[in-house]
Amino acid sequence: MCPQRQFQSFTTTAESTLSHTTHKQLSGATIYDEPENFLEIEVCNPKTHFPSGDAKGMYTDYEIICRTNLPGFSKRSSSVRRRYSDFELFRKLLIKELQLSNHPKVSVQHLPGKILLSNRFSDAVIEERRQGLNKWLASVAGHPLLQTGSKVLVRFIQDPTFQG
């Protein structure tokens, strides 16, 4: 379980674009209904691994939890684990996908920087990176064109065997 159950939710409903005055006129049941289209995503639960029993092979991965009802996603809820290098590959493939699909105006931000310090496995550093990756993925997943048209985004968020 993620320590803070605070999903980033992105809706693409007509109701989400209504004015404040119109919103007040909606019934209580309508206001609290599930949005027509939504994508909730969170990067959480970092876990450090020691595959060879020594510090040389150590790495940290992060759980990505997703809930959605967008038609392009095959699963309504999913949980996968990703390393920082997976995020790097995802960003590279996403930029390539955007260029090929003629959407060069969609800007993909840089990832939070690589950590090259000896304390990169400290709890504070890992939490800082988790927060940075969560913010970065929220900005990517929150883009309407990527929510509805990126096959790379869907694979990264939902395919446990994501290899690019």
From Swiss-Prot:
| Domain of life the protein comes from | Eukaryota
Any Gene Ontology biological process: late endosome to Golgi transport
Q: What InterPro entries does this protein map onto?
A: PX_dom, PX_dom_sf, Sorting_Nexin
**Topology of the protein relative to the lipid bilayer:** Peripheral membrane protein
Does this UniProt record's set of keywords contain Acyltransferase? no
UniProt keywords (A-Z) are: Cytoplasm, Golgi apparatus, Lipid-binding, Membrane, Protein transport, Transport
> Which cysteines does the record link by disulfide bonds?
none
PX domain sequence ranges:
40-163
Provide the residue positions that the database annotates as binding a 1,2-diacyl-sn-glycero-3-phospho-(1D-myo-inositol-3-phosphate): R83, S85, K114, R120, R129
Q: Please give the GO cellular component terms listed in this UniProt entry.
A: early endosome membrane; Golgi membrane; retromer complex
Q: Which Gene3D superfamilies match?
A: Phox-like domain
**Subcellular location field:** Cytoplasm; Golgi apparatus membrane; Prevacuolar compartment membrane
Q: Does the keyword Zinc apply?
A: no
* A GO term for molecular function: phosphatidylinositol-3-phosphate binding
- Pfam families with a match to the protein in the record: PX (PF00787)
Q: Which PROSITE patterns match?
A: PX
Reproduce the free-text note on domains from the UniProt record: The PX domain binds phosphatidylinositol 3-phosphate which is necessary for peripheral membrane localization.
* Function comment: Required for retention of late Golgi membrane proteins. Component of the retrieval machinery that functions by direct interaction with the cytosolic tails of certain TGN membrane proteins during the sorting/budding process at the prevacuolar compartment. Binds phosphatidylinositol 3-phosphate (PtdIns(P3)).
The text of the family note is:
Belongs to the sorting nexin family.
Protein name as annotated: Sorting nexin-3
Q: Which organism is it from?
A: Kluyveromyces lactis (strain ATCC 8585 / CBS 2359 / DSM 70799 / NBRC 1267 / NRRL Y-1140 / WM37)
Q: What is the lineage of its organism?
A: Eukaryota, Fungi, Dikarya, Ascomycota, Saccharomycotina
User: Quick one: which gene encodes this?
Assistant: SNX3
